[in-house]
Regions:
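A conserved acidic beta->alpha catalytic loop
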Residues: 28, 43-52, 71, 95
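Acidic helix N-cap motif at the loop->helix transition within catalytic regions
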Residues: 20-23, 48-56, 99, 103
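Short aromatic/hydrophobic "clamp" motif used to bind/position activated sugar donors
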Residues: 91
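N-proximal low-complexity "stem/linker" segments adjacent to membrane-targeting elements
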Residues: 1-30
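Conserved donor NDP-sugar-binding/catalytic core segment of glycosyltransferases
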Residues: 103-133
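Glycine-rich, basic loop-to-helix element that forms the pyrophosphate-binding segment
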Residues: 69-86
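Short loop->beta transition adjacent to catalytic acidic/histidine clusters or analogous donor-positioning motifs
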Residues: 6-9, 30-41, 49, 61-65
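Conserved nucleotide-sugar donor-binding catalytic segment
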Residues: 84, 139-216, 224
Length: 253
């Protein structure tokens, strides 16, 4: 590919104490078949050596930019810093313990070039050693606000979104499910998001990670419906039941 004829894509990766996995995550970006990207790694005051590992990676590839925050701000605010600094036409988010397949950006850009401002993809589940542990989560080819109430099919590491949309709607760190709140806000502005049914992301389930704390997540989900999305009690109850049922199917069946 000739990078001069291809739009720049900004990859935003927050990092906090990512010693075990951040280099693998970065390599999955550097190995993309689509080469015209910048990778912004926002380090949120890591206490391990992961900032140094990222800086070493940046020395060998000038597409990597490292932003070291002076104060710990949390993952949502770290993402916001990267989004604000983005120079690309599109933004793709990647958590520092997840991995992309090498054609992720290329395939999602192809969808975006057809007019999609919000793109997502299917993904599978791996353990800490990259072993597959569950059947893949295959996403629908389209979703919207009402469908996302019942089943959240977009995750941070699968997202590929027009930069102007992301910069106009930053993550809200007041809510536990800040990513879900953002997708719903975007779907109120841009009614349809488009999914690639091919698995393009490996979602690593790490022991003790926030995403694995299901009981707390369930409590906060109700708070998200009522306070963030301002849904009435009946709609919130319907959405919560569907959320719980789909969560069981996604993570346990």
């Amino acid at each position: 590919m000739e990078t001069t004829k291809q739009p720049l894509i900004t990859v935003v990766m927050p990092n906090y104490n990512g010693h075990r996995f951040v280099e693998q995550a970065i390599d999955s970006v550097l190995n993309q078949t689509y080469p015209n990207f910048e990778l912004l790694v926002v380090d949120d005051c890591s206490k391990d050596d992961s900032l140094q590992l990222v800086q070493q990676k940046a020395q060998s590839d000038d597409r990597i930019r490292v932003i070291a925050l002076e104060h710990n701000a949390g993952v949502a605010n770290a993402r916001n810093v990267g989004i604000k600094e983005a120079k690309g036409e599109f933004i793709a988010l990647l958590d520092n313990d997840d991995l992309w397949t090498e054609d992720k950006l290329e395939r999602q850009l192809a969808l975006a070039n057809k007019g999609a401002d919000i793109v997502y993809c299917s993904y599978d589940f791996t353990d800490e050693q990259n072993n597959s542990i569950k059947k893949p989560f295959i996403v629908p080819q389209q979703t919207n606000f009402n469908k996302m109430l019942a089943s959240s099919v977009i995750s941070c590491s699968t997202s590929f979104i027009k930069t102007e949309l992301m910069q106009a709607h930053p993550f809200n760190s007041d809510f536990y499910h800040e990513d879900y709140v953002l997708w719903m806000e975007l779907l109120r502005v841009c009614p349809t998001a488009y999914g690639d049914p091919k698995v393009l992301m490996h979602y690593r389930q790490v022991t003790g990670s926030r995403s694995n704390k299901k009981s707390n997540a369930a409590k906060e989900r109700w708070n998200t419906y009522r306070k963030a999305l301002k849904l009435n009690a009946v709609t919130s109850a319907w959405a919560f039941v569907r959320y719980a049922a789909n969560g069981v199917m996604k993570y346990y069946l």
